[in-house]
Amino acid sequence: MQIYMVGGAVRDRLLGRPVNDRDWVVVGATPDDLAARGFLPVGRDFPVFLHPETREEYALARTERKSGRGYRGFVVDTAPDVTLEQDLSRRDLTINAMAVRGEDPAAWELVDPYGGARDLQAKLLRHVTDAFREDPVRILRVARFAARFTDFSVAPETMALMREMVDAGEAADLVPERVWQEIARGLMEAAPSRMFEVLRGCGALAVLLPELDRLWGVPQRAEYHPEVDTGVHVMMVLDMAARLHAPLAVRFASLVHDLGKGTTPADVLPRHIGHEQRSATLLADVCERLRVPVECRETADVVAREHGNIHRSAELGAAALVRLLERCDALRKPARFADVLLACECDARGRLGFEETPYPQRQRLLGALQAARSVDTAAVAARAQARGAAGPQVGEWIRRARGDAVQEWMAAQPPAAGT
């Protein structure tokens, strides 16, 4: 029985990056061999075990053979005679198909049958063998790695193979949950726009997210958007979210906030009147199709519907600000509203020449929210009921009280913040 550290841990060590997770492959063993040594079986689709002390994953060396379309159509062989080279050959990229012999990190003996170290030096994302085409999830993984390794490029032959897979309908067969899983991971990388540029380049974006793909080539008014192209703008917004270390919900909202601009009638371009509601409608379809988690879905919906009003909030008086807070459900969900405002800041700064421009709307609305939440709604309701108010009338009393509190807060602000 031989044990090898494989995959991302080897790659990251060669790159001088921190190694957070280590994966291991065991050659020449059976499930019974590992169980006898105290390893705990956890794999459902193929034999994976947890080390009895480190709890790291150890998998039996395996081969895979395509048996159908999509992500799940595989026959797996984990016989003891499967070699390390055979196991590495099924991996997606050469930089992920390297191994180190043994469990002692000091005894560094690299096994690199497919030129992964060479491609690391050349900063290339290259597929290992033609078996790459057997798993369409690899299209998403390559795009995600492009977002992580920002100075790497996709090898031309790998991009060509990905296009062939898309043309053959493989991308359309992907399981929605897996598509979302990979997109979510890509959104959290250093340069998430690169993921979508790669997906667009191979044609997969038009299959997986056609609502997003159609934004490229759609013009916006140059006085507000010097970058003009809506697709370019959305990628700038997304990268601004990464620059500001935004959480996943904000990054997803940044990605999908302008979907409605892709359906603007050609005869009114470059104006996009009413695109906010169209964006929200398209977003609902995307979230249903990809089964996007509720937190991401709700944050993105508020951003899609209200980002224009939030941008213009400096023009609003106290009563209108309270109505905006209510539409955003900010009084009940202040933490989510903070995420909404961060996404709107990314939108405003994700424009050519506006990257360093302050966004005072964010602090102004957070201040207005704090003032509105300071109102003792129970006391206001009691006064209203004492004067004969009931039902919606009580709500109006509370709304007016919040407006008064916001007005008082605005009056106390310096002119730049309160007007």
Curated annotation (Swiss-Prot):
Cofactor note as given: Magnesium is required for nucleotidyltransferase activity. Nickel for phosphatase activity.
Enzyme Commission designation: 2.7.7.72, 3.1.3.-, 3.1.4.-
GO molecular function: ATP binding; CCA tRNA nucleotidyltransferase activity; cyclic-nucleotide phosphodiesterase activity; magnesium ion binding; phosphatase activity; tRNA binding
Binding site for ATP: 8, 11, 91, 141, 144
Needed co-factor(s): Mg(2+); Ni(2+)
Catalysis performed (reactions): a tRNA precursor + 2 CTP + ATP = a tRNA with a 3' CCA end + 3 diphosphate; a tRNA with a 3' CCA end + 2 CTP + ATP = a tRNA with a 3' CCACCA end + 3 diphosphate
Top-level taxon in the UniProt lineage: Bacteria
Domain HD: 230-331
Keywords: ATP-binding, Hydrolase, Magnesium, Metal-binding, Multifunctional enzyme, Nickel, Nucleotide-binding, Nucleotidyltransferase, RNA repair, RNA-binding, Transferase, tRNA processing
Amino-acid positions noted as binding CTP in the UniProt annotation, renumbered to this chain: 8, 11, 91, 141, 144
A biological process term (GO) from this entry: tRNA 3'-terminal CCA addition
Pfam name, any one: PolyA_pol_RNAbd
Amino acids binding Mg(2+): 21, 23
Leftover remarks: A single active site specifically recognizes both ATP and CTP and is responsible for their addition.
Comment field on protein domains: Comprises two domains: an N-terminal domain containing the nucleotidyltransferase activity and a C-terminal HD domain associated with both phosphodiesterase and phosphatase activities.
Protein family (similarity comment): Belongs to the tRNA nucleotidyltransferase/poly(A) polymerase family. Bacterial CCA-adding enzyme type 1 subfamily.
Xref: PANTHER family: MULTIFUNCTIONAL CCA PROTEIN (PTHR47545:SF1)
Function in brief: Catalyzes the addition and repair of the essential 3'-terminal CCA sequence in tRNAs without using a nucleic acid template. Adds these three nucleotides in the order of C, C, and A to the tRNA nucleotide-73, using CTP and ATP as substrates and producing inorganic pyrophosphate. tRNA 3'-terminal CCA addition is required both for tRNA processing and repair. Also involved in tRNA surveillance by mediating tandem CCA addition to generate a CCACCA at the 3' terminus of unstable tRNAs. While stable tRNAs receive only 3'-terminal CCA, unstable tRNAs are marked with CCACCA and rapidly degraded.
SUBUNIT field: Monomer. Can also form homodimers and oligomers.
Name of the protein in its database record: Multifunctional CCA protein
Organism: Paracidovorax citrulli (strain AAC00-1)
